[in-house]
Each structure stands twice: as C-alpha cells, then as structure tokens.
C-alpha cells in the first residue's frame, strides 16, 4: 500500500527534487485516494489485505479473481468484477497474482488499451505478469500516468527502460523485506518441519498432487 500512496503523491520524485536543491511544489500535485476506484487483480491473502486498506481510505474497490465467489469478495469489501470491468473503470490497478503460464503477460498492450487514460499501475506480485515493454509504451503515450514496480521480468533488471522511466517508482523486490516478515517465515518453516516429522498434515507443498 506504500507504493500506492507514493504513486498517488509523487513522493519519491518530490524527495529527489528537494534533495537536488529545488523547491518545486507545482510539479508534484498528486491525487487523493478517497472516492477513487482501485482494481485489485487477485484476491488471495495479499489482495484481501490491499482491499481492506483501500476501504479504510474510502476507495471503491473492484476485485477480479476467478476462484473467489461474489459473497466472499463482498465480505472483505470488494465488488467482484470481470477483468474488463476492472480495466475500464479503475483509477488504480494493482496486481496480486502468481506467475504461471496463464498469468504471464496478463497485462499487455491489449489490456492497457482498455484502461482509463492516466491509470496508475502497481505490480508488487511477480515479475512477468505485466509486459514491461507494453507499460513503457503506455507511459510514453500517456495512457498510463505512472507505475510502481517491486518485481521485474529480469531480476536484477539490466538497462531497463521501465526502471529508468521518470514516471516509474521502483524498488528491488522488497515486498517481504521486513524484520517481522522474515521472522514469521522462519517460524512457519520450523512449524512445517515439525509437522512432517510427526506425521501431521503437510501444508503448502508444491510437489504433492
């Protein structure tokens, strides 16, 4: 959600400008989140957390996830919508999908052409679910007003037009890089090893049918 707020208020750009010796308030007029529409693509654990924070900021939330029921989406504050409805009506779009053969370049030229002019785009999920070259084209044309990326098709990115674009906020895959998150991961690993050794249920296995 920090990416969303930074994107809405041009915080990194304004910081760099001030540190560069400028006092240029007029160039960094942002937008408020209240009353804006955010499209949350992927309503798993992280997507639901984003929905709840968006509701707290009085945003209208459209959610897309083919595996979530309308009742479930409504229960945590999202209006379940088709991907077309999300693209056409959202001021902000944030993606929270795994990278699979079905989701690779889930957002590309065709999908971006359906968006509102000036849409703000966020990817803190997985590199590759958004076509970076398509985003650069959309930024250059003004179709996308700004973007925030924490993940990339190539990590670390090399000579990336996306990273170097003036209207892109980017961080080096920091989504889970908090002290608390790292401690929690270690605890979960230890708990799961204990469960396996005591013949209890195996959770989150990627190689069990």
Predicted features and spans:
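Rossmann-like adenosine-cofactor binding region
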Residues: 62, 66-161, 177
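Gly/Ala-rich phosphate-binding loop of Rossmann-like dinucleotide-binding domains
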Residues: 51, 55, 139-140
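Hydrophobic "lid"/C-terminal helical patch
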Residues: 4, 90, 139, 189, ...
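Glycine-rich Rossmann-fold phosphate-binding loop(s) that bind the pyrophosphate
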Residues: 43-44
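C-terminal helix-to-coil terminal segments
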Residues: 13, 29, 151-209
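Short glycine-rich hinge loops at helix-strand junctions in the catalytic core
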Residues: 58
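Phosphate-binding beta-alpha-beta segment of Rossmann-like dinucleotide-binding domains, i.e.
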Residues: 1-37, 49-52, 201-205
